[in-house]
Amino acid sequence: LKAGTPISYRAGDQPNNALSLNVFNPGEIASTAGTSGVVYGVLDQLDYDKLSRVNTFAHVNHTEEQMRLGVLLCINGTGILNSWLKHNFATSLSSYGDMNELASLSPIGSKGLSIIPFGNGAERVLENKDTRCSIHGINFNIHSNGDVLRAAQEAIVFSYEYGMNIMRDMGMDINVIRAGNANMFLSSIFRQSLASVSNATIELYDTDGAVGAARAAGMGIGFYEDSKEAFSSLEKIAVIEPELEKREQYLEAYERWQDHLKEII
């Protein structure tokens, strides 16, 4: 850098991702679903999970005068499960799009099939237990590839909901979840299942962390008057609402999944 170049912004990857989605204030939620998955929300009161299943730390706009704390839920076994299935189970399919299409043939709940997706090491949300990945309820007479693929996506969604309940217990309202249009959020099954299980609206945006950091740096040097101006051009490209008429089916599948998890932990 040339001498005199202003350094006006710094942040970790998940606070920066939240910023890129214009998540600054209490009740606003950001999410990612790559190799691992994250749900990140903002609180305006000092709180923490006594079992340390989620992390609490200062958000990018926290000040002594205005408390803004980020609460981070991380699920290690997210997209890596989908990737493992692609390379070891669905080898005849050429893309994740093909996997999603096959999974869409299976009904909500995957005909009673449940997957515990924690095969990427110990999970903080489980108090650092390493449960490994497991499949429950498989029936050789009724289940097929599509059921397994759908159950995997539902398993990740259910893991998010399990963790978001911890965040709710800390006083966080989860009504809208913002995410970039990437990774597992490209799957309509994943998006719709997450919206319906959590009873939250999902908003997808055309952005990424690099763009968010550039906007933040602009705010830091005064190029933008405030965050409202900085994010005025942020493009919302899709909105996914919960399927209220089918929510009972999603919740029944979640409860079955949670019962299997309780048996393990």
Where are these regions (language model features)?
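Active-site core segments that coordinate phosphate-bearing ligands/cofactors
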Residues: L1-R178, N183-I265
